[in-house]
Amino acid sequence: MIKSQKEYLERIEYLNTLSHHYYNLDDSIVSDAVYDELYQELKAYEGKNPNSIQANSPTQKVGATTPNSFNKNPHLMRMWSLDDVFNQSELQAWLQRILKAYPSASFVCSPKLDGVSLNLLYQHGKLVKATTRGNGLEGELVSANAKHIANIPHAIAYNGEIEIRGEVIISKKDFDALNKERLNANEPLFANPRNAASGSLRQLDSEITKKRKLQFIPWGVGKHSLNFISFKECLDFIVSLGFSAIQYLSLNKNHQEIEENYHTLIKEREGFFALLDGMVIVVNELNIQKELGYTQKSPKFACAYKFPALEKHTKIVGIINQVGRSGAITPVAVLEPVEIAGAIITKATLHNYSEIEKKNIMLNDRVVVIRSGDVIPKIIKPLESYRDGSQHKIERPKVCPICSHELLCEEIFTYCQNLNCPARLKESLIHFASKDALNIQGLGDKVIEQLFEEKLIFNALDLYALKLEDLMRLDKFKIKKAQNLLDAIQKSKNPPLWRLINALGIEHIGKGASKTLARYGLNVLEKSEAEFLEMEGFGVEMARSLVNFYASNQEFIRSLFDLLNPKNSDMAEEKQESSSVFSNKTIVLTGTLSKPRQEYAQMLENLGAKISSSVSAKTDFLIVGENAGSKLALAKKHGVSVLNEEELLKRLKEFD
């Protein structure tokens, strides 16, 4: 449950990180079930707080940004994502919204294959391009690799321009064989068939793709000029062109028939040749589809009825406390080994101690564990009926398991605030050098990783002791690059006070709070909890975090301040914000722009703007790209100033 705007923003950042790993790195950090749960909580918060919706929320976009390994290619028609439903009541509500307006509507149901979406463009009967989904508007051009997928026709008996879309998958049998080969070759194993399919499709060497035995299962079309009446007719036409037929495809008239087909699929799931994670439901009548239309992210005429995640019962025999990059302590349960979906599970995350307490999970409990193709399984609940008196309460740790410093215990999370804790040093330094902190050019996460590996740095102070010969030891560092980095590090001295405060990475203290603190002078961090509470916008958690952080890191902070000699203000930056035409203005971005909306949103926020996702009478500017839609009409109704992309760029250039 998301309770505050801060938690909401953190959830967006976390889900976007998961999406990046899932879509671009072929790495499922969490299970689909865990992601879905976190995503639904985000949607629920946005439903109650529509004016707070952020442009970079995963509810507002499809997939993830396209990586740089392959050339980008636009889709002729957008590739949409599907909304999920998880139970009978949610499905009933979705169906009722459609059947109330269109009582005669019917529904095509088909297995939801867990693979990689691919868009095939045919012109004059020839396959000319194959593009991954990407962000829905553009994806990676993988034509050479797609032509090595055996069941993708290189030519079809239709000369018009048509986009045929489907899922690239690897069968369970071929996945197992592939992982055995990789094991024998001492290569990293794929976590699941979806990751294997994605990694195989995106190989730079097409011969590797050819060996992976990928398959393409069609599920729809994009741009075309054919006059289909129904979705089923469209799918039949695709099969007639030589594509593989969809197994267990059915046409249904009501909720009961859909539920029957859903449960049939669940029964067939284990024996199905490929990995399934649900059932796709699509309105069959194309005229009804057109009238229902789309949300910002997904069609209103289709949904994915998700399967329950695979689960098993086992026993918790121990607890390991792991320290994350932010200092957050994550309890991990040590389990009696249990096999789930072909993998032996010995550990499962418990997320945080608040969740342990809420679920009343105890040491030696028998518990329900789920795993849906992910690496780290999740404990759902304890089986209290199995308790025999040997169970013990799982206590929150009081000191860090790595550095033994006293922990900051909040209602939900527990943190190690020691900046010198080895488990969080690397991430602390990445934040220290970031754009909103000391903005040290050239000091990214890969460089910091190398510096740690070479034992050249252990904390921020060590950065300023680096020498040219130290940096020359790093991979790909020549004299010029090394000297540029040394110059950038030295240039970061004498920063505005707020930047140095923000660079410390104090829990609950971001850019805005750092600017407020900076107004109180160089000794601001020495103040008491009561004094912090008197500051505008500061609550108990922020005040306690500041007090505890300073108590744990006094010597380090003083040394850092002495070395960097921060300025008490930064009038240049403040003047730029306050003089900006966008300062304190509410801005909405809509339509297709040449750059990602989030990139423009960041530029505008740096000039003091507030970014919103919905137009109202309180909106000051609407930035419009192509296909602006209803927001443009609403802006005109409310008398909102409208800027196109060219006008926006002209105004932004004034502040370069």
Curated annotation (Swiss-Prot):
Which Gene3D superfamilies does the entry mention? Answer: 5' to 3' exonuclease, C-terminal subdomain, BRCT domain, DNA ligase/mRNA capping enzyme, Helix hairpin bin, Nucleic acid-binding proteins
**CDD domains hit by this protein:** BRCT_DNA_ligase_like, LIGANc
Q: Which GO terms describe its molecular function?
A: DNA binding; DNA ligase (NAD+) activity; metal ion binding
- Highest taxon of the lineage: Bacteria
The residues that the entry says bind Zn(2+) are: 400, 403, 416, 421
- Which key words tag this protein in UniProt? DNA damage, DNA repair, DNA replication, Ligase, Magnesium, Manganese, Metal-binding, NAD, Zinc
EC number annotated for this UniProt entry: 6.5.1.2
Key word Transmembrane present: no
Q: Which residues bind NAD(+)?
A: 32-36, 81-82, 133, 167, 306
Q: Which cofactor does it need?
A: Mg(2+); Mn(2+)
Q: Which residues form the active site?
A: 112 (n6-amp-lysine intermediate)
Reaction(s) catalysed (UniProt annotation): NAD(+) + (deoxyribonucleotide)n-3'-hydroxyl + 5'-phospho-(deoxyribonucleotide)m = (deoxyribonucleotide)n+m + AMP + beta-nicotinamide D-nucleotide
Annotated BRCT domain residues = 577-656
List the signal peptide residues.
none
PROSITE patterns given in the database record: BRCT (PS50172), DNA_LIGASE_N1 (PS01055), DNA_LIGASE_N2 (PS01056)
**Stated family:** Belongs to the NAD-dependent DNA ligase family. LigA subfamily.
State what protein this is by name: DNA ligase
The scientific name of the source species is: Helicobacter pylori (strain Shi470)
What phylogenetic lineage does the species belong to?
Answer: Bacteria, Pseudomonadati, Campylobacterota, Epsilonproteobacteria, Campylobacterales
